[in-house]
Amino acid sequence: MIIVNNTLAFKLKNAPHKPGCYLWKDDAGQVLYVGKAKDIFKRVHHYFNPNRSFKTRALVERIADVEYVILKNENDALNLEAKLIKQYKPRFNLVLKENNGYLYFFITASVKPTLELGRRYEFSKNKYFGPFASSKFRLRDIYDLLLKLFPLRKCAPHERGHPCFYYQLKMCMGQCMGEDTPERYQTTVKGIEQFFNHGPEQVLNHLQQQEIKASEQQNFEAARHFLDLQKAVLELVNMQQTAFIKAKQSHDFIGYVFEKNVLAITVFAYVDNQLIGKNQQVFELPQDDEKEVESALVTFIYHYYSTNKIPKTLTVSLSEENLSLLANSLKINVTQPKNGEQKSILQTVIDNARYALNTKWTGFINNLNRAEVHQQLAQLLQVPSIQSLEIIDISFYDKDHVVGAMLRYENGKRMKALSRRYNINIDHKGDTNYMADVVYRRIISSIQTHKQLPLSDLLIVDGGIAQINTVTKVFASFPNVTQPIIIGLAKNTRHQTDHIVLTDNTTINIDKNTPLFAYLTTIQEEVDSFAKHNAFKRVSRARFQNPLLQIEGVGRKTVQILLDNFQTNAKHWSCFFERIITVYSC
């Protein structure tokens, strides 16, 4: 049974029967999920259905508050939802991966435009040509060729007044030296537009004339250069990806497959009936029914075309209501597959989506199973839930090279970006003192950056009651900090994970044949490996470090001065102190 607080219950009861957006928040005020709805009341209450999937329950159990934004219609809601997701990047939302679109050539919208190659599509700011599905390295060669054909500014404005690197290579028009004119520059810009919009005939004619002129002057090296440029231009034109040069029709097909809270989406882009590229992504979703999955797909499509070129026609299998919503929002023709050929293409796209889902299925299912193990652990410890846990371990080769390690898991998934390593340099030696130092620094960091990395629900220490008591004492010195559940993960005489130790020194034996035992063993091995790896790195650095750096007040710059004058460490020790002072003072 899901329990909600009084504030949330009141807001749910008074949710509006109007279109708009809703923002689920946790008890710290962080946005967990942003959604849109034709009827906000019906949508938000749907989340609290007791028969929802585990992924949905994982979201609902974190909800402590909700915020509504009432709008005129679903189009406005779709637009605002996209902006809110971009602003908050909620952990439960489907968020597009950065730099995962097609490549475009584009002319920047500046006083002195430049030719660039990139993925981000911002039609209102720049003039784009594409998309291209060729490899980035091949397009980079073509880009270099275009820069030779159309030598627009490449150097930064602050470099003007003296010849830039490209000027010396004769690859720019001399903007840095003030040798160009606005008229000449705009003519070059129009040449690029002519090349992409109307084909290369004008460029080829120009290169042929340059070749003939160079040959007549018996400058055969230059003539060969212009001939090579002609061949490169023809190669560019013959590439499949340049079909857009005289294109009249652009048509995208989007197919998707959804199974057990995993959504795989594939996009095929066609120009004049030629496939120019494929893009696919796989996501985990908290939604688990058809309407909500369609809503998530509509959100994806709207986001996708905010950074990619919008086709004239989009074919996707959706309800008439969502087709109409996308058509009105994107201002294009959005349809179901109409004939046998379109149905065949869409089925191929769906097959690609299914393959993408199957490829990543194991990883998603493992995370899902791990999340369920978190609930089993919560039941074992007799607490409502454990959404996040952190595990700490200490590793050292000797008393001078000690490293603490912390790994964080949320719903069973390791959050690699939140892993922490602690170099320990304290006077009081011993495992419990090292543990105290790590926990103290972890609490301090949580206070300073609570929103980025708050303390977890559960803290696991590698060890028994001695380590637990040490950690408890550290938390006692921070009365305003909420102490997480603390347990120890003890090992047997064969150094294998064996049982759980609680704060009152009672133990809980774990069935060795359960997923819970396998999970705890895995995370204990992962933190042990992480700690040892970082301890080894610290020792390795120390071995190759100049011993002079161990002297208090001596830094790398001072050591370099001494090395320049004495060359070997032996000479440092044999020379007179006064001589060292003289050298250092120079």
Curated annotation (Swiss-Prot):
It is found in: Cytoplasm. Residues 17-94 form the GIY-YIG domain. One of its GO terms (cellular component) is cytoplasm. Its main location: cytoplasm. GO terms for biological process: nucleotide-excision repair; SOS response. Residues 201-236 form the UVR domain. Keywords: Cytoplasm, DNA damage, DNA excision, DNA repair, Excision nuclease, SOS response. PANTHER family: UVRABC SYSTEM PROTEIN C, UVRC/OXIDOREDUCTASE. Belongs to the UvrC family. Interacts with UvrB in an incision complex. The UvrABC repair system catalyzes the recognition and processing of DNA lesions. UvrC both incises the 5' and 3' sides of the lesion. The N-terminal half is responsible for the 3' incision and the C-terminal half is responsible for the 5' incision. This is UvrABC system protein C. The lineage of its organism: Bacteria, Bacillati, Mycoplasmatota, Mycoplasmoidales, Mycoplasmoidaceae.
